[in-house]
């Protein structure tokens, strides 16, 4: 699982099975319970400074560009895995928190 906690929150977890992510208070959180597939239309609909959080996997379309993600300041959190194309792998590695791994998708 995945726990999202705002930095100024007073909430304290004493026991947890999964991954905890602390986020800035001004970040827009888009939570998805299992898996989310991200494409250009999805990114265009996100607000600036959005954290895409999935309980399991984030799957980013191969046509996504680093510019599209950085223009909106999109970050990712996944309980398991984030998958993306080689062209944005560096951006995704720097801007993701995962419970398991970040992998390059085969085209």
Segments from the language model and where they lie:
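Small, basic N-terminal interaction modules of short regulatory proteins
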Residues: 1
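Short, T/G/N/S-enriched strand-turn elements that build extracellular solenoid repeat scaffolds
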Residues: 4-17, 23-28, 41-51, 62-76, ...
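Transition segment at domain starts
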Residues: 27, 33-35
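Conserved mixed alpha/beta catalytic, RNA-binding, or beta-rich assembly cores of soluble enzyme
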Residues: 56, 61-62
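A short amphipathic beta-strand at an alpha->beta junction
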Residues: 81-85
